[in-house]
Amino acid sequence: MKKISILGSTGSIGVNALNVIRKIPEKFQVMHLTGNMNTEKMIAQGKEFLPASITMVDIQAAEIVEKALKGLSIEIYSGRDKLLDLAGDKNVDLLLNALVGASGMEPTLKALENGVDVALSNKESLVVAGDITVSYTHLTLPTKRIV
């Protein structure tokens, strides 16, 4: 079973990734989910996938999610710093970076620095910092079969 973190789980790519995981739950354990402000989707995802943690970049959104998921064994965090911490979690096999724009660059680098495989849907990580991003690939390559 592969442990996966999804940055941007409430966006279209994150939602589609969770749809795949839903079809093959024996293959993946969702460890971390992150979002910005979409509390409704995040609450539903938290209840269904029971990740170890959820991080909402927006502090007020995190408070809403925390209240809704009270009683479940899910750690709720807020802020970009926490998102960066979990991006580098060495206990995760795969990080799906579905963040929009340049905001996804730093988490990508953090994961690669720590030897975490990255599934990148965020082209800005390559456009803005392609040389830097590629320079870390020796820490995760050769590519491993995920499913």
Which role fits each region the language model picked out?
Residues D117-V118:
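A short hydrophobic/small-residue beta-strand
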Residues M1-A102:
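N-terminal glycine-/serine-/threonine-rich beta1-alpha1-beta2 phosphate-ribose binding loop
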